[in-house]
């Protein structure tokens, strides 16, 4: 949302100084990108009030038109037959777009949204759908292991657990789930070749 509002202000400034006119460049219609802005807003789990709510409301209208080939293809692959809503953004589309960065190819999410080649987009969307299935499996596997360790320290004010070779792409999600389960801050450290990587989640 912040980036979008910056672009709106920049667009207005360039219009006022007649930059588009002088460069003979068509002024971009930023409204067309509200589907992506609203998707990011929902997936960032920010409160849907004020400007955020307005952005998501208009973004859903843009998403309904399915102008973005990547989102359209992903919607079809996911079998969304109704008008996409906030649930679809946060729990169906968002996780698949993010899955590439968690267990597959980190560039897949961005490539899905900017590619206009139907064949390539379908391939990327299909792979993201598969990555998401792998992510779910890994998440549950790691969650089971970490929950056992977390239960040993559940009386501590902050739950800190560490283990070897827990998939770093899912420890953030697991930390969030354990934070909700125990209502305490959670820090998860995965160690691979003596190098530890951590993810932390805290309560409000």
Residue ranges and their predicted role:
Residues 12-204:
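Hydrophobic helix-and-loop "lid/oligomerization" segment in the mid-to-C-terminal part
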């Amino acid at each position: 949302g912040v980036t979008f509002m910056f672009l709106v202000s920049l667009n207005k400034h360039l219009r006022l100084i007649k930059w588009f006119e002088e460069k003979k460049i068509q002024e971009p219609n930023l409204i067309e990108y509200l589907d992506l802005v609203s998707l990011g807003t929902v997936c960032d789990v920010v409160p849907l009030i004020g400007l955020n709510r307005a952005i998501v409301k208009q973004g859903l209208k843009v998403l309904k038109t399915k102008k973005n080939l990547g989102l359209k293809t992903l919607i079809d692959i996911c079998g969304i037959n109704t008008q996409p809503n906030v649930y679809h953004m946060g729990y169906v589309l968002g996780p698949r777009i993010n899955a590439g960065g968690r267990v597959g190819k980190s560039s897949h999410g961005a490539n899905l949204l900017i590619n206009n080649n139907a064949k390539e987009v379908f391939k990327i969307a299909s792979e993201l759908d598969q990555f998401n299935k792998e992510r779910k499996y890994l998440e549950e596997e790691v969650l089971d292991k970490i929950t056992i360790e977390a239960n040993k320290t559940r009386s501590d004010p902050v739950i800190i657990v560490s283990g070897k070779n827990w998939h770093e792409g899912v420890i953030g999600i697991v930390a969030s789930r354990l934070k909700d389960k125990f209502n305490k801050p959670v820090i998860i450290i995965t160690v691979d070749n003596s190098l530890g990587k951590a993810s932390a989640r805290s309560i409000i």
